[in-house]
Amino acid sequence: MNWDDTTDAEAAAERLVGAAADGEDQAVEAALRPKDLGEFIGQEKVREQLDLVLRAARARGATADHVLLSGAPGLGKTTLSMIIAAEMEAPIRITSGPAIQHAGDLAAILSSLQEGEVLFLDEIHRMSRPAEEMLYMAMEDFRVDVIVGKGPGATAIPLELPPFTLVGATTRAGLLPPPLRDRFGFTAHMEFYGPAELERVIHRSAGLLDVEIDPTGAAEIAGRSRGTPRIANRLLRRVRDYAQVKADGLITQEIAAAALAVYEVDARGLDRLDRGVLEALLKLFGGGPVGLSTLAVAVGEERETVEEVAEPFLVREGLLARTPRGRVATPAAWAHLGLTPPRPQSSGNGQPDLFGA
């Protein structure tokens, strides 16, 4: 299947192991979402630090500092923003960077906030530059200048804002300009989850969804969930379907493995796209190095899809390396696919010849 380079986010959402949320995820996550920091599983350091920030703000009777949460999709940034609002007993307004393309869009949102309200701005790195610049003043001074008129006759009318808490979320913190990053009083990076934490997530979700699962079934799903709770919950739902149709409803290790084999998610969490990239790299190019464009053609995908959808997990798992000369498979990639690496050929000086010539 081919995806246009403007639809990589949609491509990631369509994959069973994609971290982007689809419509079903959003509906189910609302029911599974923890309501306070005590219910939130994982991210121990972030929770501990955030708890101190919120407790101190409540003790002072003040709004909480602005919060910046960074990390991969599916790790709980939206959930934490809602928990912040709940802990502060404040309403929450949710929007996203792509929805704010003009300073006027942001001014309309800010001017309608209540005192103490939490504004959650997802994908904050995708906000327009004029809106970013307006946000600087709003975060620091709780006011914005609204421009009335055009040209030499334009005037700036200051608009006072009630104190509010901005919670920004981003998957690409490096794209945020320093003046914006510096205005957040608390910043945290969300880490990928370990297997034990994911098993706890799966058991909790299974209880809320009234799904029977034993520890071996939870461990099997956790091992294929790429360190991401959203993926773990999605795999749990698909395995539940299989268990209800093909078995007695109880999810065991055998049932989970059989179900995920049907959905082409292997023991390490790779799907058909991931394995296609690795198989092309190993079988067609001897493990590389090979250029990204050439590899994409061999796989039958767009360059951007290979680079942005498939490669990040393969690199994180130590199966593929990005080098100045191209993509190279690691020994772990050969082992995972059960293939034997070619023996390096020697040149006349007795040294291995990189090009096999």
Curated annotation (Swiss-Prot):
Catalytic activity field: ATP + H2O = ADP + phosphate + H(+)
Segments of this protein annotated with the region Small ATPAse domain (RuvB-S): 194-264
SUPFAM superfamilies for the chain: P-loop containing nucleoside triphosphate hydrolases, Winged helix' DNA-binding domain
Region (Head domain (RuvB-H)): 267-357
Residues binding Mg(2+): T78
MF terms (GO), sorted A to Z: ATP binding; ATP hydrolysis activity; four-way junction DNA binding; four-way junction helicase activity
Top-level lineage group: Bacteria
Residues bound to DNA: R303, R322, R327
Biological role: The RuvA-RuvB-RuvC complex processes Holliday junction (HJ) DNA during genetic recombination and DNA repair, while the RuvA-RuvB complex plays an important role in the rescue of blocked DNA replication forks via replication fork reversal (RFR). RuvA specifically binds to HJ cruciform DNA, conferring on it an open structure. The RuvB hexamer acts as an ATP-dependent pump, pulling dsDNA into and through the RuvAB complex. RuvB forms 2 homohexamers on either side of HJ DNA bound by 1 or 2 RuvA tetramers; 4 subunits per hexamer contact DNA at a time.
Protein name, UniProt field: Holliday junction branch migration complex subunit RuvB
Species of the source: Streptomyces coelicolor (strain ATCC BAA-471 / A3(2) / M145)
